[in-house]
C-alpha cells in the first residue's frame, strides 16, 4: 500500500471540495479506498457537522491504522452490514438506543485469537480482519474489546445520512467487501474537526474529500 505522505500527487484539491465535479470526487475517493488511503467524509452541517477518516476494512495496514488512531478520536469503529452483524452474532450495545442520531453500536469486539491487549494498531487490524472474514462465525470475535462495530441500515445513505452508511457505501462502490473503518477527525486541541479544519487536513495529506450529500446525489442518479 502507498505511504500516507504529504508528497503524494495523486489528488489535487480545490479550496473547497464542492468546487470539483462530483464524478471526479467520487472517482478519487473510490481509488483511495482501493489503494488503502483514507477518505475524509463530512456529514451535513445541520447534523453532526463532523469529519471522519474512512478506510476500506480489507485494505488496512499498520501505517494507515496508526494514522487513524493518531489523528482522530481513537475510537476505531468497524462499519458493517446487517447481514454481517447477524453472521457474527453481535448484539446491540444497548436495548433502547436513545442516542441523538440513532448510532447503531453493537457490543465492542476483539479477535478471539492473535491479539495481546487488543489496543495496538496491529491488534485492532487483527480484530477487524477476523470480523470481516467471509467464513467468520459467532466464534470469530469476543466481547468486550477495542473495536466498536456500527451497523449500517439497509438502503444506505438514501435511508440514513450517516457516516456509517456512507462508509459502507464507499467500500461497496469501490468493489470491495462492504465493510469500512471510521474514526472522527479531531483538532490538535481535542476539539472536533469541522469543515474548514477537515479541508486543511485533507490538503496537507493529499486526501480526497466527500460529503454525505455527495453520496446521496450519486445514489439518486446511479442507484
Curated annotation (Swiss-Prot):
The site annotation (Essential for catalytic activity) covers 146, 184
Pathway(s) served: Cofactor biosynthesis; riboflavin biosynthesis; 2-hydroxy-3-oxobutyl phosphate from D-ribulose 5-phosphate: step 1/1
Matching Pfam families:
DHBP_synthase
Record: residues binding Mg(2+) 2: 48, 163
Enzyme Commission number(s) of this protein: 4.1.99.12
First-level EC class: lyase
Respond yes or no to whether keyword Manganese is given for this record: yes
Q: Partners and quaternary state? A: Homodimer.
Q: What is this protein called?
A: 3,4-dihydroxy-2-butanone 4-phosphate synthase
Which organism's genome codes for this protein?
Cupriavidus pinatubonensis (strain JMP 134 / LMG 1197)
Tell me what gene encodes this.
ribB
